[in-house]
Each structure stands twice: as C-alpha cells, then as structure tokens.
Amino acid sequence: MGETIKCTFNLFEEGRQYTGHHRNYILESAIKACYAPETREGIRLREKLGYLGHGRREIARKLQLAEVEPVKLPDGSTIIVENIPSNITTFFEVNKDGIVEHHQEILETGPGKVVSGLNASKVGGFSWACGGQDGGAMGATRIVDFHGFDYVMNPGFAKN
C-alpha cells in the first residue's frame, strides 16, 4: 500500500478571499451523501477513486468513470481515454460543525506518483467529486452523491 495523506477542512471556511468558488454548501446534504450506504460501501470496497485533476470527469461528462471512456472531440471523432486513478478514499467523515476529514491512499501508479510529488512540494490539494446542484457564490450548493477526491492545482478549500 502507498502513503496515506490525511486532510481536514471546514465547509464554511474556504481559506480563500480572492480565488475559489465561494460555494454555500447545505451541511445536511454533505452529511447525507457522506453516510449514504452507497458511499460507505464504495469506501469499504476501495471504489471511491481519485484522479490527477477533475479533467477526466469533465471530458467524460460524468463523475463515475470506467477504466476507459470514449470521448467525442470537437471535430466529431472519438478517442478512447484510459482513466488511471491516483488515489483511493479510505476514510471520509463530515460532522455537524461542517468539519470534513478524509484520508487518501496514494496509489503506485503514474498519476499517483505525480500526486505524491506535488503534495510533498505543497502544490495543489484534494477536491471532492460530488454530484448535486451547484448554487455558485450566490445560491445554495446541495450534494447528492460522492465519487472520490481528485488532486487539483487550486482546491476549493485551501487547507485541503
């Protein structure tokens, strides 16, 4: 097994003033998604995978990725993209005060090695991949499901 990175952040304290998404999370929805039976089972079975960046999920237009995904290019052609994870969520909790704690086991894969190096250099951090309704800076953001934590260059929560 690879190294484990333990993170804690507060849903109501982004640690950013000028950058970030400034979302107003509905706490109850985050707690419900965290403790949903499918989330707990996915963590237990080591299926809540994370990737280097959100890009793979974005180009596939879905949060739950297969090992390979067909991706349609602007010219109409299709390519096959391999989705090699960098990390696995092994622990995930959200408490009534909005404190989120999660542990990420870094995988012995190419992307995992990049994540390990970036983290050791204090560049980037983890960002959760959740389905739901994004209210942006002015509305309420509701989480309905959890798919893992990706490693991104500018995480929404600076302490993550």
Named regions from a protein language model:
Residues M1-N160:
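Signature of dsDNA virion morphogenesis modules
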